[in-house]
Amino acid sequence: MAYVITEPCIGTKDASCVEVCPVDCIHEGEDQYYIDPDVCIDCGACEAVCPVSAIYHEDFVPEEWKSYIQKNRDFFKK
């Protein structure tokens, strides 16, 4: 399992998460950041520093943002 960046990131794109990620698995997209699920080590460092609380462990993404799990995976299939 990995962490997922959800809707609150859109329009904010604060790079605090990128700066603290020890494995550089967070990538910038057009509208938000994305976490590479194949590289994420589940350390949670990104979740703690997100100023808009947009980052959740995949198992705990709120129901209204569950679609971001697939959106995140699809970003890395390109």
Curated annotation (Swiss-Prot):
InterPro entries registered for this protein in UniProt: 4Fe4S_Fe-S-bd (IPR017896), 4Fe4S_Fe_S_CS (IPR017900), 7Fe_ferredoxin (IPR000813), RnfB_subfamily (IPR050294)
Cofactor(s) this protein requires: [4Fe-4S] cluster; [3Fe-4S] cluster
Cofactor stoichiometry and binding remark: Binds 1 [4Fe-4S] cluster. Binds 1 [3Fe-4S] cluster.
Domain 4Fe-4S ferredoxin-type: 2-29, 31-60
The keyword Cell wall biogenesis/degradation is annotated on this UniProt entry: no
A GO MF label: 3 iron, 4 sulfur cluster binding
UniProt keyword terms in alphabetical order: 3Fe-4S, 4Fe-4S, Electron transport, Iron, Iron-sulfur, Metal-binding, Repeat, Transport
Gene3D superfamilies (UniProt xref): 3.30.70.20
Residues that hold [4Fe-4S] cluster according to the record: C21, C40, C43, C46
Keyword Metal-binding: yes
Protein name: Ferredoxin 7Fe
Organism: Hydrogenibacillus schlegelii (Bacillus schlegelii)
